[in-house]
Curated annotation (Swiss-Prot):
PANTHER family assigned: VASCULAR ENDOTHELIAL GROWTH FACTOR, VASCULAR ENDOTHELIAL GROWTH FACTOR D
Disulphide bridges, residue numbers: C116-C158, C147-C194, C151-C196
Secretion signal, residue range per the UniProt entry: 1-21
Post-translational events: Undergoes a complex proteolytic maturation which generates a variety of processed secreted forms with increased activity toward VEGFR-3 and VEGFR-2. VEGF-D first form an antiparallel homodimer linked by disulfide bonds before secretion. The fully processed VEGF-D is composed mostly of two VEGF homology domains (VHDs) bound by non-covalent interactions.
Protein's recorded name: Vascular endothelial growth factor D
Stated family: Belongs to the PDGF/VEGF growth factor family.
Superkingdom in the source lineage: Eukaryota
One of the GO biological process terms: fibroblast proliferation
One Pfam family here: CXCXC
Cellular compartment(s): Secreted
Region (4 X 16 AA repeats of C-X(10)-C-X-C-X(1,3)-C), start-end ranges: 227-323
Keywords annotated in UniProt: Angiogenesis, Cleavage on pair of basic residues, Developmental protein, Differentiation, Disulfide bond, Glycoprotein, Growth factor, Mitogen, Repeat, Secreted, Signal
Induction, per UniProt: By the transcription factor c-fos.
Length: 358
């Protein structure tokens, strides 16, 4: 009996050992593969952000869900008031709280001014022409356009792609002085086109410089925490998690920022019109409330029908062309019929008379 019990324990321990060995052999491989793919994805995202050539492109990469809303906020200054609206009306998940539209416009303008492009600059004529030291010009420098500005990738430089030559009239002076200064035409290179071009052989992957982080700042292995669209980075778990599992950073006190809609329960954001619009339209004879999208009143009234030279019918909430035999007075104290509509001859004179005495 003891022999059978001992043999059973040995077999059980051997089974546990095999299971543990399998897990230790295959488990880390799976985790390492996931970590490697995550790191590769983060590096690709970082390269895309580094290569962004405009504010709109950067926002499209960093906030791909809301980049059209960002574009609208940049173009329409009136949408800046969305930040001060209530939580249930025209609130955004990212933009409304953390960024200001005017600040984004300033950043965009600064970005555009620093792009690689021909810029007016001052060059020394003698250095440009390679003249000897016994010859100089007055004025010594001229204004021309040369390529300058920043590129969006490492390993490239702003260089000219097309050049023209402009003529400048200058005084050429030679020493020792043997004659009066001579007026001569001088041709100087003027850059008309610029582009960011590589300065040497390019590596298959761009070199990404990283700063050293102290353990107190971040204990996670990745210095960049870019996640897929439907996920967010969790500093405590050191991984990307679904948005439902963790609040947005800095929005713990603003739960309305995590709402799935941008404009409230009754409205949706129209990307073409760059504004919130009601989800369901009202019937043709009703007016829609701009805030809560409720339907109320008639589109037509006594005054509106009068301006159209028609008759207002409250029972159908519409303006009709059919003119009755008696004159009705509009809110402007002008008759709706008698001048603009045809009716029986025997009542026309009465209608015309009623215009003077409604």
């Amino acid at each position: 009996m003891y022999g059978e019990w001992g043999m059973g324990n040995i077999l059980m321990m051997f089974h546990v050992y095999l299971v543990q060995g399998f897990r230790s052999e295959h488990g880390p491989v799976k985790d390492f593969s996931f970590e490697r793919s995550s790191r590769s994805m983060l590096e690709r995202s970082e390269q895309q952000i580094r290569a962004a050539s405009s504010l709109e492109e950067l926002l499209q990469i960093a906030h791909s869900e809301d980049w059209k809303l960002w574009r609208c906020r940049l173009k329409l200054k009136s949408l800046a008031s969305m930040d001060s609206r209530s939580a249930s009306h025209r609130s955004t998940r990212f933009a409304a709280t953390f960024y200001d539209t005017e600040t984004l416009k300033v950043i965009d303008e600064e970005w555009q001014r620093t792009q690689c492009s021909p810029r007016e600059t001052c060059v020394e004529v003698a250095s440009e022409l390679g003249k000897t030291t016994n010859t100089f010009f007055k004025p010594p420098c001229v204004n021309v356009f040369r390529c300058g500005g920043c590129c969006n990738e490492e390993g490239v430089m702003c260089m000219n792609t097309s050049t023209s030559y402009i003529s400048k009239q200058l005084f050429e002076i030679s020493v020792p002085l043997t004659s009066v200064p001579e007026l001569v035409p001088v041709k100087i290179a003027n850059h008309t086109g610029c582009k960011c071009l590589p300065t040497g052989p390019r590596h298959p992957y761009s070199i990404i410089r990283r700063s050293i982080q102290t353990p107190e700042e971040d204990e996670c292995p990745h210095s960049k925490k870019l996640c897929p669209i439907d996920m967010l980075w969790d500093n405590t778990k050191c991984k990307c998690v679904l948005q439902d599992e963790t609040p947005l950073p800095g929005t713990e006190d603003h739960s309305y920022l995590q709402e799935p809609t941008l404009c409230g329960p009754h409205m949706t954001f129209d990307e073409d019109r760059c504004e919130c619009v009601c989800k369901a339209p009202c019937p043709g004879d009703l007016i829609q409330h701009p805030e809560n999208c409720s339907c109320f009143e008639c589109k037509e009234s006594l005054e509106s029908c009068c301006q159209k030279h028609k008759i207002f019918h409250p029972d159908t909430c519409s303006c009709e062309d059919r003119c009755p035999f008696h004159t009705r007075t509009c809110a402007s104290r002008k008759p709706a019929c008698g001048k603009h509509w045809r009716f029986p001859k025997e009542t026309r004179a009465q209608g015309l008379y009623s215009q003077e005495n409604p």
